[in-house]
């Protein structure tokens, strides 16, 4: 197995900054704001070809109440998961009682622990770390994570020797293969189309919705563990949490996102960052679960978020949560509202669930797989052209300036979402109603469910446009004789 490194410490000591530095990403939110990271966050890192998984955690300060108590629990769980712990302290703030409490807990776990003193930029490192020797964790490694100073030394003198002590693995590591695939997809390194197998890649599933609709509760229900912080307060999740998982022999990357509110209500800068992360997660996902609160109904913000999902071309599963406890009359009213406000989304499955009690959750993944398979299915040019021809035979394109629009052939233009490119004459003059007819015809013929279909039209070019035919000498002589004959006849 790939070794796991956990970053733990008080709030705002720079754990997320070091996480971003180690994973060479900006996946963890970073701001000068205590308690910003609330959930365990995983990332892939590498030292001289040796891979490891890095876990970013929320801070522990010993005064937790409410949601902060759950944050501390997440950090303690990360310690249990890890093979080695990087215990981070703030060199500028000095030794704090919470540092001593964390050190005591780490000593009791008997796990390899390295003490890292962050924020030493502008300080004398030797002088700044003196007080931390009283924690009894051995040598201290001074760094400035925001500038990268000391991080390379930390990798070379701490993590690399520790990893080299691990027994070498002769077999190919499944986790290493997974993260290699994950990184290749993130960097856009796609295989040749003929060799592409969508079933070989994990399905990225983003769970999105307004604040406090039950996204993290649903995530924990799916995973069967308290993996992300759940608290009855809007805005508990601030970052997008990427969680690898497997279900029924299929690999997934579950993305729990922050809730998205109306722009006018977002005043906290950290929340603005969280919304950006949510929108990026939608762009990054293969399938999006839009969670709606059955007790509050469909808001304009739900429709706005739905519009972003559709514009991104992502596959969609609509989840109506908190269905338990509603009277039959209220349920019928909710369904009528759904039909009225979401009637234009006729391709997405709608599930009525209770994430808290688990009812209906088991059926979600059937729709997720259906949507993913539909969005990545390869269809040949002959099949698409045949469907287009049948659509034209059933309903001819309209006349434009007395001439019939002619559709010649169709081919695939992309996947996730499926794109059909149709070539023809005067296609730019096709009315929107006929374009919708073609889109629905392709959807029904290809049995596409859970994903939007996009149709692009390309005008057929006249190969003789702007070209003049050059006459041969024989043709020139014939032309002269013809012109003489015409003049004589006049």
UniProtKB/Swiss-Prot annotation:
Entry keywords, A to Z: GTP-binding, Nucleotide-binding, Repeat, Ribosome biogenesis
Q: Is GTP-binding among the key words of this record?
A: yes
Identify the residues that the record assigns to the KH-like domain, covering every copy: 377-461
User: EngA-type G domain location, by residue?
Assistant: 3-166, 203-376
Which N-terminal residues, if any, form the signal peptide?
none
Record-linked InterPro entries: G_ENGA, GTP-bd, GTPase_Der, KH_dom-like, KH_dom-like_a/b, P-loop_NTPase, Small_GTP-bd
Keyword Transferase (UniProt): no
Q: Where does GTP 1 bind?
A: 9-16, 56-60, 118-121
User: What Gene Ontology molecular function terms does this protein carry?
Assistant: GTP binding; ribosome binding
A single Pfam family it belongs to is KH_dom-like
Where is GTP 2 bound in this sequence? 209-216, 256-260, 321-324
Q: What does this protein do?
A: GTPase that plays an essential role in the late steps of ribosome biogenesis.
Its subunit composition reads: Associates with the 50S ribosomal subunit.
Entry-linked HAMAP family = GTPase_Der
Q: Which family does it belong to?
A: Belongs to the TRAFAC class TrmE-Era-EngA-EngB-Septin-like GTPase superfamily. EngA (Der) GTPase family.
Protein name per the record: GTPase Der
């Amino acid at each position: 197995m790939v070794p796991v490194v956990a970053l733990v410490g008080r709030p705002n000591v720079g754990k997320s900054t070091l996480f971003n530095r180690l994973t060479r990403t900006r996946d963890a939110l970073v701001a000068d704001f205590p308690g910003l990271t609330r959930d365990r966050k995983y990332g892939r890192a590498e030292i001289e070809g040796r891979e490891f998984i890095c876990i970013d955690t929320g801070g522990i300060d010993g005064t937790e109440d409410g949601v902060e108590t759950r944050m501390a629990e997440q950090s303690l769980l990360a310690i249990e998961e890890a093979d080695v712990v990087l215990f981070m302290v703030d060199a500028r703030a000095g030794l704090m009682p919470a540092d001593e409490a964390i050190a005591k807990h780490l000593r009791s776990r008997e796990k390899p622990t390295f003490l890292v003193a962050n924020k030493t930029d502008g300080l004398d490192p030797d002088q700044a770390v003196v007080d931390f020797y009283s924690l009894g964790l051995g040598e201290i490694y001074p760094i400035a994570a925001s500038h990268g100073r000391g991080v390379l030394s930390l990798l070379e003198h701490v993590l690399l020797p520790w990893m080299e002590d691990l027994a070498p693995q002769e077999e190919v590591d499944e986790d290493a293969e997974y993260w290699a695939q994950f990184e290749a997809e993130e960097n856009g390194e796609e295989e040749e189309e003929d060799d592409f197998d969508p079933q070989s890649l994990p399905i990225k599933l983003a769970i999105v919705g307004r604040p406090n609709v039950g996204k993290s509760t649903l995530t924990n229900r799916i995973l069967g563990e308290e993996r992300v912080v759940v608290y009855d307060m809007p805005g508990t999740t601030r970052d997008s949490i990427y969680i690898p998982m497997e279900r029924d022999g299929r690999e997934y990357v579950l993305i729990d996102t922050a809730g998205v509110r109306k722009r006018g209500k977002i005043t906290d800068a950290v929340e603005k960052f969280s919304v950006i992360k949510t929108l990026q997660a939608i762009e990054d996902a293969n399938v999006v679960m839009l969670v709606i609160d059955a007790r509050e109904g469909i808001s304009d913000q739900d429709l706005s978020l739905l519009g972003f999902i559709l514009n991104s071309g992502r596959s969609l599963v609509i989840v109506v949560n908190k269905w338990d406890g509603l009277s039959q009359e209220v349920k019928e009213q909710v369904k009528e509202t759904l039909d009225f406000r979401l009637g234009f989304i006729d391709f997405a499955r709608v599930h009525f669930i209770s994430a808290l009690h688990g009812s209906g959750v088991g059926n979600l993944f059937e729709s997720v797989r259906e949507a993913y398979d539909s969005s990545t299915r390869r269809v040949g040019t002959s099949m698409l052209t045949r469907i287009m021809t049948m659509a034209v035979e059933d309903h001819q394109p309209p006349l434009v300036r007395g001439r019939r629009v002619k559709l010649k052939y169709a081919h695939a233009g992309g996947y996730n979402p499926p794109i059909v490119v149709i070539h023809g004459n005067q296609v730019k003059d096709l009315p929107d109603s006929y374009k919708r007819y073609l889109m629905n015809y392709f959807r029904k013929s290809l049995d596409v469910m859970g994903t939007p279909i996009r149709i692009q039209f390309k005008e057929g070019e006249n190969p003789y446009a702007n070209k003049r035919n050059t006459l041969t000498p024989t043709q020139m002589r014939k032309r002269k004789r013809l012109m003489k004959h015409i003049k004589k006849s006049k």
